[in-house]
């Protein structure tokens, strides 16, 4: 029985490896967080970039931990409830502030990630100008909120690379379709491995 279990595990691992290497099933992320990270990665943002996080909910937490996993380490977290900001900041080894302190933050940033439940834009022209604190150069904003957290007019008035939730969701839907096209190839590989497994078991008996 022990040998059979080991054989099952081995065959399962080989099947999974084949599926991932011989098909494109893993090449097209379908989560907004994964897609947001990929867009940021493709911008060649340095690991010491100053990352400002507005909102400490699940989406921002997941993206922040994704960034931390990929060696980003300079985080500042703002949230309406300070305790939640402190919790996420502690996990990221960053700094926490209440959301109402955002307008007074003068330490600058390179990447702004925002996702709150606000019904109106939080990042207004006045707030954004204050956050820049005179800094020049392109900034990256990842707005994952619905409705949006940033005033979209900012994109026309400032040097901003915007990664918006709408485009990420559209990409996720396209990737879901692409994954669907790969399922037939995956099924063929799985069936092939099942056949091999049955032959091996039959020989052992």
State where each predicted segment sits.
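Adenosine-phosphate binding glycine-rich loop
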Residues: 42, 129-140, 144-205
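Short, structured coil segments at secondary-structure junctions
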Residues: 71, 91-92, 156-158
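Glycine-rich adenosine-cofactor-binding loop
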Residues: 29-33, 37-68, 72, 76-80
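Helix N-cap at the beta1-alpha1 junction of Rossmann-like dinucleotide-binding domains, i.e.
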Residues: 82-83, 146
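Short, charged, surface-exposed secondary-structure boundary motifs
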Residues: 86-87, 107-109, 170-177
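Short beta->alpha hinge that forms the Motif I/post-I loop of the SAM-binding pocket
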Residues: 80-81, 101
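Glycine/serine-rich phosphate-binding loop and adjoining beta1-alpha1 elements at the start
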Residues: 1-47
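Rossmann-like NAD(P)-binding element
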Residues: 95-97, 102-127, 133, 137-142, ...
